[in-house]
From Swiss-Prot:
Keywords: Cell membrane, Disulfide bond, G-protein coupled receptor, Glycoprotein, Membrane, Olfaction, Receptor, Sensory transduction, Transducer, Transmembrane, Transmembrane helix. Disulfide bonds join C97-C179. The chain crosses the membrane at residues 29-49, 108-128, 142-162, 196-216, 243-263, 272-292, 311-331. This is Olfactory receptor 1E3. Glycans are attached at N5. The keyword Translocase does not apply. It is a multi-pass membrane protein. One of its GO terms (molecular function) is G protein-coupled olfactory receptor activity. GO terms for biological process: adenylate cyclase-activating G protein-coupled receptor signaling pathway; signal transduction. Residues 1-28, 129-141, 217-242, 293-310 are extracellular. It comes from Homo sapiens.
Length: 343
């Protein structure tokens, strides 16, 4: 039993990334570019789907939700990482740490559910094309999305409440760049058995079951595609669901590499690199995968935006000018710190 006079900690120290001091500014510029690209790319996908009437379909409603989730998921960890990379005291208050853990769980699990919903869309579109509009009605799509948000809220709230009841009284150094659930459990000085069981049980429901559903839907999709006699039908099917399969592989590939590899192969550097891939890089690549490999995203938005001159100008500014301004700012930042180090 914990002693009453034992001091309770009020903040944690985030060790951050295992980067050499001379490489700090280079990686800061790299992560800043990744974060800005993630924000602009996913925001552009959301705006394009909203403005183009040809994309007002269940599949693209799910895609806009996925882009919003990617945008928010990166914003949970990347700004704090960038701040701590330029700070001499990379601390985070206990309440802020719980909030970061909550939103990290929320948007991570939400993406898993959204990928399952989108896989179901692809499955119906390819395996039952004549009944697609009947099965995937707007009401059905909205119901699946609402269920995903509700289940995600319950999952993140449960873990956060269980974490809030724990006591942290000794070690307050987190060997990570964000407040990860498993890392916080190792620092607790009270009984974490309930948290461990809930994490094991909920992890199976939240990750394993959606992953199995994705595997089964992909297997049915591939078998249906292989039975299509015409080359045009195969190309259309891959154009519809090829980007989604790429995103699924990227998302679950990083999770498997981070959490499901043999424990003997785990080390801090490897786990940190995989966590950066999981929290930053995958969400940056998602809008590019959907835009470059999906014919609807490449074709119809351009035709629609030509009739919206104001937004067309806005698009040119976002895509063309802002990256140049960001690049100039990054170069100036590197030169400033380089001159200080030389002096």
């Amino acid at each position: 039993m914990m002693k009453k006079n034992q001091t309770m900690i009020s903040e944690f120290l985030l060790l951050g990334l295992p980067i050499q001091p001379e490489q700090q500014n280079l990686f800061y510029a790299l992560f800043l570019a990744v974060y800005l690209t993630t924000l602009l790319g996913n925001l552009l996908v959301i705006v394009l789907i909203r403005l183009d009437s040809h994309l007002h379909m269940p599949m693209y409603l799910c895609l806009s939700n996925l882009s919003f989730s990617d945008l928010c998921f990166s914003s949970v960890t990347m700004p704090k990482l960038l701040q701590n990379m330029q700070s001499q005291n990379p601390s985070i208050p206990f309440a802020d740490c719980l909030a970061q853990m909550y939103f990290h769980l929320f948007y991570g699990v939400l993406e898993s559910f959204l990928l399952v919903v989108m896989a179901y869309h692809c499955y119906v579109a390819i395996c039952f094309p004549l009944h697609y509009t009947t099965i995937m009605s707007p009401k059905c799509c909205l119901g699946l999305l609402t269920l995903s948000w509700l289940l995600t809220t319950a999952h993140a709230t449960l873990h956060t409440l269980l974490m809030a009841r724990l006591s942290f009284c000794a070690e307050n150094v987190i060997p990570h760049f964000f407040c990860d659930t498993s890392t916080l459990l190792k620092l607790a000085c009270s009984n974490t058995q309930v948290n461990g069981w809930v994490m094991f049980f909920m992890g199976g429901l939240i990750l394993v079951i959606p992953f199995l559903l994705l595997i089964m839907s992909c297997a049915r999709i591939v078998s249906t595609i292989l039975r299509v006699p015409s080359t045009g039908g195969i190309q259309k099917a891959f154009s519809t669901c090829g980007p989604h399969l790429s995103v699924v592989s990227l998302f679950y590939g990083t999770i498997i590499g981070l959490y499901l590899c043999p424990l003997t192969n785990h080390n801090t550097v490897k786990d940190t690199v995989m966590a950066v891939m999981y929290t930053g890089v995958t969400h940056m690549l998602n809008p590019f995968i959907y835009s470059l490999r999906n014919r609807d995203m490449r074709g119809n938005p351009g035709q629609s935006l030509q009739h919206k001159e104001n937004f067309f100008v806005f698009k040119i500014v976002i895509v063309g000018i802002l990256p140049l301004l960001n690049l100039v700012g990054v170069v100036k930042l590197i030169m400033k710190y380089h001159s200080k180090s030389v002096a």
